[in-house]
């Protein structure tokens, strides 16, 4: 990510085709280590491509990736109502109970005297 950030900073600074030395100097300015392999890979992947098209393509791909966190989504869908945080707080408790129940169903407990 730091190599990509350095590349984008170079572009924002007006450098239309940053070199590996440009990226290394940007990374060195903030005390970050420069990985030559990652820099070369990035430069080879973006060579001759428009950065705005690459970003748009990346956004489309990220939009199609399913994301976890159903509790966060449910809380966000609440629209800021006062009950949303309470509902989100109750969800993990229900999951913990089901895990305990599943252990009991298997007849396995860490604290059995058997």
UniProtKB/Swiss-Prot annotation:
Alphabetized InterPro entries for the sequence: P1/P2_N_sf, Ribosomal_P1/P2, Ribosomal_P2
UniProt feature, compositional bias: Acidic residues: 98-114
Compositional bias ranges of the Gly residues kind: 74-83
Entry keyword annotation includes Ribosomal protein: yes
UniProt record, GO biological process: cytoplasmic translational elongation
Region annotated Disordered, chain positions: 74-114
GO MF annotation list: structural constituent of ribosome
UniProt-listed Pfam families: Ribosomal_60s
Any one annotated GO CC term: cytosolic large ribosomal subunit
Organism superkingdom: Eukaryota
Keywords: Phosphoprotein, Ribonucleoprotein, Ribosomal protein
Post-translational modification as stated in the protein's UniProt record: Phosphorylated.
Biological role: Plays an important role in the elongation step of protein synthesis.
Family statement drawn from the similarity comment of this UniProt entry: Belongs to the eukaryotic ribosomal protein P1/P2 family.
Subunit note: P1 and P2 exist as dimers at the large ribosomal subunit.
Name of this chain's protein: Large ribosomal subunit protein P2
Species the sequence originates in: Parthenium argentatum (Guayule rubber plant)
